[in-house]
Structure formats: C-alpha cells, structure tokens
Amino acid sequence: MSWFKRIRVSNTSRVVALSSMLAFGIQIAFALLMLRLFTPQQVGEFSVISQIGFFWMTLALAQTPLSLLANQHIPAHSAAKQAWHASAMRALGLLPVAALAIGFSQLSMWPTMLWVLLLAFCQMGWMLAQSLTLRAGSSWQQAAVRVLPPLTAASTALIGALFGSWMAWTGPTLVLSALIGYAVGAAWLIPAWRERKEPNPNEQALSVERPAQESVKHAPPSDPRSATLRMAHTLADALLATAIIVVWQRLYGAEETGWMTALLRVLGFLPAVVHMAWAQVALAQGRHTQTSQTALANPWWLGLAAFACVIVLGLSCAVALYQKWLDPRWHGVWAYIAPLVLWQGSACLSAAFSHRPFQTKSARGYSWACIALGLLQALVLFAPIGLAQPIEAEQHMAAFALMSSLGLLALAVWMARLR
C-alpha cells in the first residue's frame, strides 16, 4: 500500500469519524429532547414503531450496504442502483412479517403500518446512500449524509413539540420527525440514477496506485457468503434487535420500554460510530490487514476508547438523574444504566474488529458466529414469557446484558486472532 493511499484512507476515516461524532452529539440532543418534552409512554410507542421499521428495513437490505463496500469490482453507482431495486422487492415481500410484528406489539394496525412502511423505505435509502458516498462521494458528501438527517429530525422534533404545546396538538411528532430525517438521508441516493461517463476521482486515485497484477495477487476485501447465509445473518440480527423492544412492550408496558429505549438510543450510537468510522472505511478503501503488532493493537485501543465513552455517558445519565435534572417520570432509567453500559461497551469492542473477517476471507465463519450468539441472546430474552411468574424488568435486562456482553467479547477475541 502506497503512502498516498494510506493518507487518503486516514483522511476518509477522519472525515467519517468527525461527522459521525457530530451526528452522535445531535442524537444525544435528540434523546435529551425526548426526555424533556415527551412522556415515557410517547417515547416507548415511538421506539416500538421505529424499531419495527428498522427490522423491516434490515431484512430487506440483507447486509447489502456491507456488500456494496466489500465488492469493489462493481461500479459504485450501478451497484447502488441494483441494491435499491433488490432491497425494495424484498421489502414488499416482507410486508406480512412487518404486520405480524405490529400485531405482536399490541399496537393498532392502522396507522402504525403506514408509519412503519414509510420509515423502513426511507431508512433503507439512507443506509445505501451512506455506503454509496463512502465509495464515490467527496468528503463533504460523506459528512453531510451522516449529519443532516439527524439534525433535520432533531430540529423537526423541537419545532413539533413547541407547536404541540402551543396548539395542544397530540399528533405523532416523534415519528414524523424521524421520517423527515430519513427522507433527507435517502435523497443522497439520487446520484445513483445519474449516468456518469467519467470515472469517479476518488476511485481513479486509488486505481492509479494499483499495478495491473495487484488485482490477482491482492484481491480487495470481498463478501463470499451466499445470499442465503447473508439473509440468515440479517434475519438473526434484525429479529433480535426488534424482539428486545417488542418483548419489553409486551411484558412491561410502554413506560418501561421508554426508559430502556431512551438510554439504549444514546449508548447504542457509539458502536455504530466505531463501525462506520473504522470498519466500513477500511472496507470501502480496500484496505488490507496488516500483520504488525501495532496494527493489531489499533482496534483494541479504539474499542476500549469507545467503551470508556460509553461509561462516561452512563455516568452522565446517572448524574442527571441524581441531580433531578430530568422529570421524575424518568426515574426508572436508573435500573438500566449499568447493564446497558456493559452491553454497548462490549459491542464497541466487537465493532472495532468487524472488518477483519472480510479482509481474511472468514466472513462465513463470522456470520455463523453471529447467528449462534443471536440464538443464545434470544433464549435469554424470551425465557420469561414461558415462566409461570415473570421476572422483573431489571433482572431480565441484567441477565440479557450479561449474556450479550460475554458473547460480544468472545467474538471480538476471535476476530482479533484472524490472519
């Protein structure tokens, strides 16, 4: 790898990291806005609707954004267009699954189905747009596609809350705000439908540094998994992420769900930042695994630093509750701070190594390991439903977070050993 290419990867990673951190700050502001201006029940219902939409979108994508980054032999714009068509068709086929999830959550089918559909398709476009800009976008485009959607959503939620208090309007402010934000993000996918005669300057700069024989000797990271395995991996991840919200709604009610999801929304963004600013950039730039001890240590330091940030955020939330800066109705968040910090901190360590399987041709093993972990997590999550006397929400989350953390740490150790 040439000096120029190293510098370019570093700059791209820095841009994505900074923009992701800015988006993270906006997400925190959005979460604080929900804590101050909305009730736990409103936050809980919004979390259920948005999570079902996320579940639908994730299944429809079937890890297509990751494949779009890993398989660089396909032109970026053509690949994005094909990915959208295939994902949209899968989304339509999964409509009954989304309806089943809504029914299980015990929310009214209408207009919940409409909101879920709109959220799913707009978020699907935004996810593909992020991968597209990583491969074929400028630095400012890579930053804007990450920052503008959450900024739009937070601004809309604030305006909607103020308008609602002034006009006594009780409409779905949070859902509308999220929908507008996702729509702004999906708009960045429009360039995929524009024919481009000339090569993209970003991709051209990389090709200048690559000798003709390098494509044979050093193939870029790829995704060799079958479509069935990718779908199974996606299904396991999406089902678990949605089941957490839906099971909490069913067993413990909207208020308890609001306490859990509000904190999870803040802490859960850090693993996403690590994945976007580190793993995805490494895949998008065709970066190969380095064998030096220093290179191997970098993901550990990155993951540990992110873990420390999760701890700081958890402590900040505890201080806010202790100092009574939040409404007394949010006192129930106390029980979720420690387990969620442990769970999401472990997720940061795992995310720091998530590019390694694709660089070492171990993607199949990675998918099977993630599926196995998801099954173990599901057993812990659904166990109280079959008990004659359900356990308390605090005990349930403690058991689930412990199992998840141990599994994620084991996964991180395995990925760190890949060569």
Label the model's feature ranges.
Residues 113-122, 143-196, 372-377, 390-418:
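Hydrophobic alpha-helical transmembrane segments
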Residues 76-92, 224, 290-306:
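Interfacial transmembrane-helix starts/ends
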Residues 50-58, 260-280, 310, 340-347:
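Transmembrane helix-bundle signature of multi-pass secondary active exporters and lipid flippases
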Residues 1-26, 67-68, 192-197, 201-233, ...:
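N-terminal membrane topogenesis motif
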Residues 27, 58-77, 263, 267-291, ...:
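Helix-loop junctions and terminal segments of transmembrane helices
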Residues 8-62, 228-255, 265, 401-405:
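Signature of the first transmembrane helix
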Residues 122-145, 344-370:
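Membrane-interface junctions at transmembrane-helix termini in multi-pass inner-membrane proteins
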Residues 40, 104-116, 316-348:
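Interfacial segments at transmembrane-helix termini and the short loops linking adjacent helices
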